[in-house]
């Protein structure tokens, strides 16, 4: 029974990590299609990550649901990171 539960939880964790990585790759590929230089792309990624993380942490401290207001312009906040929709 315990082994089955551990296996199910492990598979769920792997699935979450895989999904997150896939979303990051998709966001990067969509940005690359626009034709932004790598330096600008890195700056945008860093800015979105910081904005989203700060916004989520502030809202969590107030015991409210994280509404992720900082991600705009085709971005959404997921796992405290902005990803391209």
From Swiss-Prot:
Question: What's this chain's function?
Answer: Postsynaptic neurotoxin.
Family membership: Belongs to the neurotoxin 12 (Hwtx-2) family. 02 (Hwtx-2) subfamily.
Pfam families, per this entry? Toxin_20
Q: Which domain of life is it from?
A: Eukaryota
Q: In which tissues is it expressed?
A: Expressed by the venom gland.
Q: Does the keyword Cell wall biogenesis/degradation apply?
A: no
The record, for InterPro entries, names:
Hwtx-2-like
Its primary localisation, in coarse terms, equals: secreted
Location comes to: Secreted
Annotated source species: Cyriopagopus hainanus
Provide the alphabetized UniProt keywords: Disulfide bond, Neurotoxin, Postsynaptic neurotoxin, Secreted, Signal, Toxin
This protein is called what? Answer: U4-theraphotoxin-Hhn1d
Q: Does the keyword Signal apply?
A: yes
Q: Name one GO molecular function term.
A: toxin activity
